[in-house]
Amino acid sequence: GFRAAIDPVLLAAAVRAAYGHRVLDAGCGTGAAAFCLAARLPHAVITGLEIQGAYAALAGESADLNGMGTRVRIVEGDLGGPPDLGAPFDVVMTNPPFGAAQEKGGGTPPPEAGLATAHMESHLGLAAWIKACLKLLKHNGRLVVIHRADRLSDLLAAVAPTCGDIHVLPVW
């Protein structure tokens, strides 16, 4: 079955949200980061957006089974052209696919299609992913991203034109 890694736990731990803030988990997968955040910040209202129907269904079922169905809403959709999510959000958190597309030297994707989609960039490269997240964010909102250190320059290039206050928190 699906197992969550440490990345979504660290992502959720880095989010600061005040009472009533709305948080989007962009590319939520099975909801691990959203559930960690909901457990830590019971006042937050969280929406998870996931392109893969099976993962979105599993995340929605998990929210209900864990008593979080009223605070964690899962929506199936594409970040590149999202459905109406009620944006803008106070916080957008995201754990984008870590693997660059194969044609960009990203290596061989996992053989299972769901994992390949979750782990490898597809129609949205990293810069497009970040720009899509920024479009869903309120003015002066927070974007929280977890990614590999070797992609830091790409991340900074994607946020620099529109973000003012940038903090990089190394995770060792």
Feature annotation, model-predicted:
Residues 14-86, 91-94, 99-106:
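Conserved SAM/SAH cofactor-binding pocket of Class I
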Residues 1-18:
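S-adenosyl-L-methionine
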Residues 97-128:
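Mobile active-site "lid"/loop adjacent to the S-adenosyl-L-methionine
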Residues 4, 122-172:
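Conserved Class I SAM-dependent methyltransferase catalytic core
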